[in-house]
């Protein structure tokens, strides 16, 4: 059994090595440009709360260095995503038919675009609104906000990556439909459960306020509907199966 899996494990190791190597190279580049990247990350806070943004602090000796490394890794991961998606496709492509292999460019492009769309939606809409709501709530309670660069970067990267990955839902649905794991009737049948899972996922991945949760859950429900339409084109349920339901 191991001998049968050996070629696949070797191929998996190769694809992982290329992906990690790309991230390492991009990390070095991004670390050299960390000041510019950090300015981009702070822009949403500056846009809505400029006075608060002037007083972002460092309270631990190692915090500045660790934050610079986190920012660099975050940017390196984002820039490496097209390569990571490409390597994933190259790993699964040998098990596909020739006509399915021609989907490699659309798959990588679609996956990259959807992640970028989710990250941009979070950057331009969710992060500014969430920060304004949360910090103003504290100010209204007579609390003095003391924001450290480490906590800001942790918050920012968590929600941006969460939105980017969440927006991959149509891509994942397309892939599962293409290999025959799901059809449109499956998604329609589990719609209510999916909405519940979306709201639970949003509650875990967003700040603890209702606004941020709905800003994630709303688009995801829409993307679930888009996934149904995509799967309906890629792997529609048989007519007799639909009539039974």
UniProtKB/Swiss-Prot annotation:
Any GO MF annotation of the entry: proton motive force dependent protein transmembrane transporter activity
Record-stated family: Belongs to the TatC family.
Disulphide bond pairs: none
Record membrane topology: Multi-pass membrane protein
Role description: Part of the twin-arginine translocation (Tat) system that transports large folded proteins containing a characteristic twin-arginine motif in their signal peptide across membranes. Together with TatB, TatC is part of a receptor directly interacting with Tat signal peptides.
Domain of life per record: Bacteria
Subunit structure: The Tat system comprises two distinct complexes: a TatABC complex, containing multiple copies of TatA, TatB and TatC subunits, and a separate TatA complex, containing only TatA subunits. Substrates initially bind to the TatABC complex, which probably triggers association of the separate TatA complex to form the active translocon.
Protein name as annotated: Sec-independent protein translocase protein TatC
Keyword field: Cell inner membrane, Cell membrane, Membrane, Protein transport, Translocation, Transmembrane, Transmembrane helix, Transport
Transmembrane spans: 17-37, 73-93, 107-127, 159-179, 191-207, 210-230
Major site of localization recorded for this protein: membrane
Locations listed in the record: Cell inner membrane
GO biological process, one term: protein transport by the Tat complex
InterPro entries found in the cross-reference section: Sec-indep_translocase_CS (IPR019820), TatC (IPR002033)
Cellular component terms (Gene Ontology): TAT protein transport complex
């Amino acid at each position: 059994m191991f001998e049968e899996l050996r070629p696949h494990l070797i191929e998996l190791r190769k694809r992982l090595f290329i992906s990690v190597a790309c991230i390492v190279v991009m990390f070095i580049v991004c670390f050299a440009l960390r000041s510019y990247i950090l300015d981009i990350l702070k822009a949403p806070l500056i846009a809505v709360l400029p006075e608060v943004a002037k007083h972002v602090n460092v309270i631990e000796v190692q915090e500045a260095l660790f934050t610079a490394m986190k920012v660099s890794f975050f940017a390196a991961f984002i820039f490496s995503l097209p390569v990571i998606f490409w390597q994933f496709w190259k790993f699964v492509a040998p098990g596909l038919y020739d006509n399915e292999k021609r989907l490699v460019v659309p798959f990588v492009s679609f996956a990259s675009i959807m992640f970028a769309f989710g990250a941009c939606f979070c950057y331009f809409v969710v992060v500014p609104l969430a920060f304004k709501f949360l910090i103003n709530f504290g100010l209204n309670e007579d609390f003095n906000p003391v924001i450290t660069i480490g906590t800001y970067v942790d918050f920012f990267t968590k929600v941006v990556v969460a939105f980017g990955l969440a927006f991959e839902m149509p891509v994942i649905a397309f892939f599962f439909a293409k290999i025959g794991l799901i059809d449109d009737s499956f998604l329609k049948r589990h719609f209510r459960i999916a909405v519940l899972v979306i709201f639970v996922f949003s509650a875990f991945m967003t700040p603890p306020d209702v606004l941020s949760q709905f800003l994630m859950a709303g688009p995801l429900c829409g993307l679930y509907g888009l996934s149904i339409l995509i799967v309906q084109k890629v792997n529609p349920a048989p007519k007799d199966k639909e009539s039974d339901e």
